Amino acid sequence: GFAHKAKCLHNAALFRVRNAFTAHNKTALTANEKEVQGELALLKGQKSYYVPGYGILQRLMRITNNPDFFSGLPMQTAQHVIRQVCTDFKGWLASLKKYRKDPSGYTGKPKMPGYCRNDTASYLFTNQDAVIYDGKLKLPRIKIRIPVRRRHGRLMEVKVKPVSGGYELLLVYQVKDASVQSGKHAAAVDFGVDNTMAVVSDTGKSILFKGRFIKSVNQYFMKKKAERISLMSKGKETTERVWSKYLDRLSAYRTSYIRDCFHKMSRKL
């Protein structure tokens, strides 16, 4: 699927950025560095690139007819994957520069961005590939239409994140700047466990959000997690971490449930 293709393209782009960076000012190059330098030599103009930017990297993918770049991802999706790789690498270089000036602000030396070891990676669709029609989201090459709530704004992009055997969609809209009006009244919010939120205001109105639903799902999660880990840990070293797809799904359920509760509470508030 797209998530696997995005992962392959991410690693292919990062491979070229990393090896171009490590080959800089070196005489004895590794086989990987020689391969990347050979590809860069195909580009007319400057022969050496310290850190290939988005424009250089995209040209490199096209001129070499890179199979991961032309694997079937929508073109703007593939371009975003490459752009994100360049952004992450430049962010690492900026952090490294700050670390060398003042290491006290870091717990350790920033590590170079690593390859994606999972079988899938996050990606996005722009509004040229993802559209909302008749209250349903249409994504490329997917027959299922996903119902979405109508928003007052223009859909800009859809971010797709693989989560526990499924996918989490984040829809980004462009809306007009809302004017914030400062009112004459005030309210206070107190967060707790038994009562998730207690809200009072100077208008005399108050609202109380019970926390038993969140406590209940959290207790259920901890109970099932302990049972499964105990079962999986039999005959193994106690220091060895055990995990499974079932625990992934269980964790995702707990997270989604609690997130949904807070969204509903904030909406009512």
How does the language model describe each region?
Residues G1-L269:
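Nucleic-acid substrate recognition interfaces
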